[in-house]
Amino acid sequence: MTNLFENYGRLPFSLIKGEDQYLFDDRGNKYLDFTSGIGVMNLGYSFEKGKVAVKAQLDSLSHLSNLYQNPLQEDVAEKLSQNHSYKAFFCNSGTEANEAALKLTHLIKKDQKILAFTDGFHGRTFGAMSATMQEKIQAGFSPLLPNFVASPFNDVVALEQILEKEKIGAIIFEIIQGEGGVLPISPDFVEALKSCQQKGILLIIDEIQTGIGRTGKLFAFEHFDFEPDIFTLAKALANGIPTGAMLAKNKYASYFSAGKHGSTFGGNPLAMASANEVLKEIDSDFLEKVTDKGIFFLKLLTEKLSVKATVKSIRGLGLMIGIQLTDEKKVPEVLALLRENGLLALSAGHDVIRLLPPLVMTKVELQKGAELLEKIL
């Protein structure tokens, strides 16, 4: 008997402790974590500077409404602002960040349509869900919000056809579709989207899963020299303390005048204290190490797994990697066998094993994970 809604497919054990990149359950089992709490714990479970900052803030002030100045918000916003090119709005989650982005877009572009891509994922609240072009996510919730249009990801021809047919004001997308199957954006699609921006279409980049160092850059769009009009963050921003952020170019700041949007808990002192330490930690040296480990891990997985009959492809960027299986029915079985052997991983799409290890994981542990995957597959 549970008093909880059963909207999650929970596994039959509890995780009770975390250390660095390891998790421990209530039965005494130890797991090497290749999930990071679904891309949240980028600095692992023992990020001491973050813990110290949160504990100190808890002793000082745990909540402050947005009726007053908040220097901690200013500190974090400055670190995210790309040399003061963007203004920040803080909230509590990824879907809230995307809702803020969509509201701002509506104020700027009025009744023009927003284009989103099939298999993208932007959240489960109504606006974000309307932009999430996955039938399994939208099923049962019609009518969704109007003025959203779908097009296949990485399909330049389809994009051009949509632009000819519809009055598109903005495009929302991920650099790597995470929930959709760890599918990276293609170079020709990058150029097509930049061309859209040059024609006055807003680019909204969802960095909820790819941001905060996951791909070897602070933001994944930096790999492709994008300058998004709007981008969104959450998950790893405060390393386990719930927070989200929507950032927009300075020229759009006036659209969110007083009272146009808000959040009771957004940018609260505990989250900002943690986020401030996270952003201090993820400097250029740290990101170089993530890039190096990502290259090492992807090469290792390719060498060990590409010859397997069960593996169709291996793809990713930095420490965000997907292993596509030839038989989608094998995904739950592989995940279960990995758990039994002390490794936690995720699924994505319908046929992909998704690996999101903490960015602090060592090459020794990455190799251990690769060897176990080789054995299981």
From Swiss-Prot:
<feature type="binding site">
    <location>
        <begin position="206"/>
        <end position="209"/>
    </location>
    <ligand>
        <name>pyridoxal 5'-phosphate</name>
    </ligand>
</feature>
<keyword id="KW-0663">Pyridoxal phosphate</keyword>
<keyword id="KW-0055">Arginine biosynthesis</keyword>
<comment type="similarity">
    <text>Belongs to the class-III pyridoxal-phosphate-dependent aminotransferase family. ArgD subfamily.</text>
</comment>
<feature type="binding site">
    <location>
        <position position="124"/>
    </location>
    <ligand>
        <name>N(2)-acetyl-L-ornithine</name>
    </ligand>
</feature>
<comment type="subunit">
    <text>Homodimer.</text>
</comment>
<dbReference type="GO" id="GO:0005737">
    <property type="term" value="C:cytoplasm"/>
</dbReference>
<feature type="binding site">
    <location>
        <position position="264"/>
    </location>
    <ligand>
        <name>pyridoxal 5'-phosphate</name>
    </ligand>
</feature>
<comment type="pathway">
    <text>Amino-acid biosynthesis; L-arginine biosynthesis; N(2)-acetyl-L-ornithine from L-glutamate: step 4/4.</text>
</comment>
<dbReference type="InterPro" id="IPR004636">
    <property type="entry name" value="AcOrn/SuccOrn_fam"/>
</dbReference>
<dbReference type="GO" id="GO:0003992">
    <property type="term" value="F:N2-acetyl-L-ornithine:2-oxoglutarate 5-aminotransferase activity"/>
</dbReference>
<protein>
    <recommendedName>
        <fullName>Acetylornithine aminotransferase</fullName>
        <ecNumber>2.6.1.11</ecNumber>
    </recommendedName>
</protein>
<keyword id="KW-0963">Cytoplasm</keyword>
<feature type="binding site">
    <location>
        <position position="263"/>
    </location>
    <ligand>
        <name>N(2)-acetyl-L-ornithine</name>
    </ligand>
</feature>
<dbReference type="InterPro" id="IPR005814">
    <property type="entry name" value="Aminotrans_3"/>
</dbReference>
<feature type="modified residue" description="N6-(pyridoxal phosphate)lysine">
    <location>
        <position position="235"/>
    </location>
</feature>
<dbReference type="InterPro" id="IPR015422">
    <property type="entry name" value="PyrdxlP-dep_Trfase_small"/>
</dbReference>
<dbReference type="GO" id="GO:0006526">
    <property type="term" value="P:L-arginine biosynthetic process"/>
</dbReference>
<dbReference type="InterPro" id="IPR049704">
    <property type="entry name" value="Aminotrans_3_PPA_site"/>
</dbReference>
<dbReference type="InterPro" id="IPR015424">
    <property type="entry name" value="PyrdxlP-dep_Trfase"/>
</dbReference>
<dbReference type="Pfam" id="PF00202">
    <property type="entry name" value="Aminotran_3"/>
</dbReference>
<feature type="binding site">
    <location>
        <begin position="94"/>
        <end position="95"/>
    </location>
    <ligand>
        <name>pyridoxal 5'-phosphate</name>
    </ligand>
</feature>
<dbReference type="GO" id="GO:0030170">
    <property type="term" value="F:pyridoxal phosphate binding"/>
</dbReference>
<dbReference type="InterPro" id="IPR015421">
    <property type="entry name" value="PyrdxlP-dep_Trfase_major"/>
</dbReference>
<keyword id="KW-0032">Aminotransferase</keyword>
<dbReference type="GO" id="GO:0042802">
    <property type="term" value="F:identical protein binding"/>
</dbReference>
<keyword id="KW-0808">Transferase</keyword>
<keyword id="KW-0028">Amino-acid biosynthesis</keyword>
<dbReference type="InterPro" id="IPR050103">
    <property type="entry name" value="Class-III_PLP-dep_AT"/>
</dbReference>
<feature type="binding site">
    <location>
        <position position="121"/>
    </location>
    <ligand>
        <name>pyridoxal 5'-phosphate</name>
    </ligand>
</feature>
